[in-house]
Design a protein with these regions (language model features):
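N-terminal pre-domain segments used for targeting or regulation
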Residues: 8-16, 55, 64-66, 92
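Beta-hairpin "wing" of winged helix-turn-helix
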Residues: 80-98
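Exposed, interaction-prone assembly regions rather than primary DNA-binding/catalytic cores
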Residues: 124-222
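Short amphipathic alpha-helical interaction segments
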Residues: 23, 59-86
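Short, amphipathic alpha-helical interaction segments positioned at domain boundaries
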Residues: 96-132
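Compact, well-ordered interaction domains used in eukaryotic information-processing assemblies
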Residues: 65-73, 94, 154-162
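Short alpha-helical segments that sit at the start of domains
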Residues: 1-44
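Short acidic, hydrophobic short linear motifs in intrinsically disordered regions
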Residues: 41-62
Length: 225
């Protein structure tokens, strides 16, 4: 299902350094996190994004500007995660540039869902996920069950909800699925059914337990976690 678009790299890690994100992954995660949180258009230009990410990592913004430019123009925009939100007028510089203005960026619907899988955003990512899931139309009964189920997990088991969405976004980032939005039950099932077999087995087992057995399981997890 892959096409000519370059896949987003937000989960890419070095093969020789376990779980350490590549420079491209760090930049793209930084761009998405910045656009998810920052409201001012003036602070969502390429230069402002470069400044924000550079400050966080203690480096010069000039050293990552070209990477930011490339990530936006060659990856995040073509993949449908980011779009140009408009242009800001310039009072100085070349006349042509003043007339054209400087672009600022924003997350698309797909981008909001991708952002909910990025830990750097903190608690806001669950709020973003909840906002997106709430907006899903109930066309089919299975989609309604999916929507209400994820909303319940966000409130009661946010870590599990996060795992489900992260696995889904990971499949998108590796090109296993071409589009992640709109989210529907069939598409979600095709990606995560094998990834949550352990949780499903546990939940189905607990449902069938007697009250004293449920209490034992609860105590067991308290002891080992």
């Amino acid at each position: 299902m892959k096409d000519h678009k370059r896949n987003i790299a937000i989960f890419d890690t070095f093969k020789t350094r376990n779980k350490k994100f590549t420079g491209e992954a760090v930049r793209q995660r930084g761009i998405i996190a910045h656009l998810a949180i920052e409201q001012s258009p003036e602070l969502r230009t390429r230069t402002s994004i470069a400044h924000a990410i550079a400050k966080k990592h203690g480096i010069l913004w000039q050293n990552i500007y070209s990477g930011i430019f490339r990530d936006l123009d060659e990856v995040l925009i073509p993949s449908g995660v980011v779009k140009e939100g408009g242009r800001l007028p310039l009072r100085r510089g070349p006349k042509a540039l003043q007339l054209e203005g400087v672009p600022f960026y924003e997350l698309t619907e797909t981008g909001l869902l991708v952002a909910s899988s990025i830990e750097e955003i903190g608690d806001n990512r669950m709020k973003m996920l909840e906002r997106y899931i709430t907006s899903i139309p109930s066309v089919a009964q299975s989609d309604n069950i999916m929507r209400e189920g994820i909303l319940l997990l966000i409130r009661m088991a946010p870590s599990f909800a996060s795992k489900i969405i992260s696995e889904y976004i990971y499949a998108y980032s590796t090109g296993l699925i071409d589009k992640i939005t709109p989210l529907d039950s069939k598409k979600l099932q095709s990606v995560i059914s094998k990834q949550i077999m352990m949780e499903r087995e546990l939940i189905e087992a607990i449902i069938g337990l007697q009250p004293d057995q449920k209490e034992l399981v609860r105590s067991f997890f308290k002891v080992i976690s």
